A protein has these predicted regions:
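Short, surface-exposed alpha-helical segments at coil->helix boundaries
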Residues: 1, 83-87, 164-167
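Active-site gating/metal-coordination segments in enzymes
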Residues: 1-74, 78-79, 134
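Conserved, mostly hydrophobic/aromatic
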Residues: 3, 35, 43, 66, ...
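Short, flexible active-site loop motifs that bind/organize anionic cofactors or intermediates
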Residues: 18, 49, 130, 170, ...
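Mid-to-C-terminal alpha-helical segments outside catalytic/metal-binding sites
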Residues: 33, 146-153, 160-184
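Catalytic pocket-lining loop regions of alpha/beta-barrel enzymes
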Residues: 41-42, 52-153
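Short secondary-structure boundary segments
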Residues: 47, 130, 156-158
Length: 184
């Protein structure tokens, strides 16, 4: 409810609710109902912290429940683990073509090449958080053009990173005004 209250107080914010992967289907439905009642716009899953594989079959009932209804923001990438690999997300998207997925960190933190190779353009959205400082402005711009600015969302991973820094990276890019408008 904290996130929902902040979104109400600051209309420019879009909030997502959390979801625990070990919920029963009935509990999952109750959690989704609460997320909707709070006015939150989607669900955030962090497989590396929550210790589950994105493509684990135990998650399929949840994906069935949410497909076509709310987007799911997945933490993706990080080569220290395999829970959130872009390849795992690609399998899920193949099985659930109506699932609206946002793959954080340009599709895969520290696994950007893999993400670019396997994630289906046009079906997946990516965000810009916690990436540009590591891959550089030029590579980030290439990824924006690869996925299409209409499938890239501005993200900061605040409070981990300063939003001003994340904005500054995007300001350095050679993007059209239309691309900037789509990202923001």
């Amino acid at each position: 409810s904290f996130i929902a209250s902040q979104c109400l107080a600051h209309g420019e914010l879009t909030g997502f609710g959390a979801f625990h992967p070990d919920l029963t289907p009935a509990q999952a439905q109750q959690a989704l109902d609460q997320i909707k009642e709070l006015g939150l716009k989607g669900v955030k899953l962090h497989p590396d912290f929550q210790k589950f594989n994105i493509d684990d079959r135990k998650m399929y009932p949840f994906y069935e429940m949410i497909a076509g209804k709310l987007p799911v923001l997945f933490h993706t990438g990080d080569d220290r683990y395999d829970f959130s690999s872009p390849t795992r997300l690609a399998r899920v998207l193949s099985d659930f073509p109506t699932l609206t997925a946002v793959a954080a960190h340009f599709g895969g933190y520290r696994r950007w090449d893999e993400a670019q190779a396997v994630l289906p353009k046009g079906q997946v959205y990516v965000d810009t958080c916690s990436s540009i400082a590591f891959i550089g402005v030029k590579r980030a711009q290439e990824l924006i053009r690869h996925y299409g600015a209409d499938h890239v969302l501005f993200g900061t991973d605040f409070p981990m990173w300063d939003a001003k820094d994340e904005l500054a990276y995007l300001e350095e890019m050679d993007l059209t005004q239309e691309e900037r408008d789509l990202i923001f």
